[in-house]
Amino acid sequence: MRIFSGIQPTGSKHLGNLIGAIRGWVEGQDRGEAIYCLVDLHAITVPYDPARLRETVLDTAAILLAAGLDPERCVLFRQSDVPEHTELTWLLQAVTAYGDLQRMTQFKEKSAQQKELVSAGIFNYPVLQAADVLAYNADEVPVGDDQRQHLELARDVAQRFNARFGDTFVVPEHRIPSVGARIMDLQDPAKKMSTTAESDAGVIRVLDDPKIVEKKVKSAVTDSGSEIVRSPDKPGITNLIDILAVIRGVEPSAIESEFDGSGYGQFKTAVAEEVVAYLAPVRERYEALRPDEAHLHAILHAGAEKAHAIAHETVAVARDRMGVGPPS
């Protein structure tokens, strides 16, 4: 089984990234042929600083390695180092419906947030995302719940291409964790934890100092009740239960049972302690890895060569089926 997933190399990674995505990437190394991508081409669809982007690519690579990715057990590369991603994007636009792109929720949200230029890149973002996946004929794509719509589009595009030009692409399946797919902002549990949140108080950064992590968890917004149970009307407590359940590798019901009768203060203290302990080894390994930029570049370069070998073959078949270029 081949697994593919990508992550934006923007902003400092937070607990939601680690629990919702990166943890699954690490596990994926034991389940199949794992290919993981730093999607820097996606990052340039909104205003950004070029020098900062190059830095955050290395920051993100170091975080992924610190969290448990092993270049000997997976392919880790930078998207822009494999030009087949952009070529396949153009080819796939021939079988992508304009109306489908208009309906993408993330396009509506991101375009509404832009005060200046709304780039065509934001609109075509899902096609590039489809190309990312289909270039490797991935069987499975670990994604957050917010990416479900984009992956459904990728499936539609693959099926449409196959129907028109002959079987070419594997139609991928998504893998969304049952718990922890959406870690919410600690200060606004109606919103997903995000690197671009207006306030940093509700976002636990992977590299935050332990005392800051503890303060953020203990200051998490909760309701006026006292029961530690998962419930739609208790989003703050539900979020903390999910965080602790994922870290411990247990069902949320086990957390509810353990803290039955406990107060919110006691529960938050327990969550804070476990989050601090969970992040500590990642932060320590990151601090050892990040200064050696030559090593990080070498890992990404080696990964890009492996990725290119796969993607080049896939795109060559797609070109031939479409009648683009000389016949093979």
Segment roles from a protein language model:
Residues 98-102, 135-142, 245-255, 283:
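Short helix-capping/linker segments at secondary-structure and domain boundaries
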